């Protein structure tokens, strides 16, 4: 009886050691993860480094060379609410995810569509915007075209930005067309303006802006967008503290009306055009 009691006490003591050890390890791991999170690094550094690429009206330069646009406003407001400065890191779109993964910047805020293929490499916040793909075409070369099927031929050239969801949408919707890809979206639009491509696929409302700007050379062949995709903030995988903060922040700026006001200004008006001309 005495031997059994001693054995039982030893088992309880051993179990207690295991439990306390697990708790200590868990606390230590949680502390380590918090210290290593992007959120903590940004707060400690005092600067939020944002990876982005220029495309109108999400991110572009004004007359003085300063970056402006919807994504610029989003990143600037986010940094302000965090109590830090913002630093923009212009990056070619095709290499923007690898640059995030290697630590060139903290987050991607650049109109990035939340795609399953991208989700394998990075984590995304909840959507802060939704966009769809649209087209603008050359009046001479695409005369009479008003359906996706009209562009789905090998002799039709579609211009897109390299590595973009526009490229993915074009390949899926017009698999037979010849795709011509560019590092900068403005180059894709210039290709159509120069008559070297039939059309360009891009996120709405940019194609409509170009059609309005060059009514003698361009037109909108489709009445509506032909895709719809959510836009989120991209962060490195495993960084759940940062992701949770971004999700809470997005809900906050949606609730106070700021996000909708910025969308209206950049996507539903053309008041900003005087700042870039």
Feature roles, as predicted:
Residues 36, 72, 87-98, 145, ...:
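Short helix-initiation/N-cap motifs at beta->coil->alpha
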Residues 49-57, 67-80, 134-187, 204-206, ...:
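Bilobed "Venus flytrap"/periplasmic-binding protein-like clamshell domains
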Residues 130-137, 204, 208-250, 269-277:
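Periplasmic-binding protein-like
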Residues 1-44:
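Short, low-complexity disordered leader/linker segments with a strong preference
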Residues 29-111, 120:
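Extracytoplasmic small-molecule ligand-binding "clamshell" domains
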Residues 48-49, 84-85, 102-110, 155-157, ...:
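Alpha-to-beta junction loops
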Residues 76, 80, 85-150, 218-220, ...:
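Acidic, polar ligand-binding/catalytic clefts
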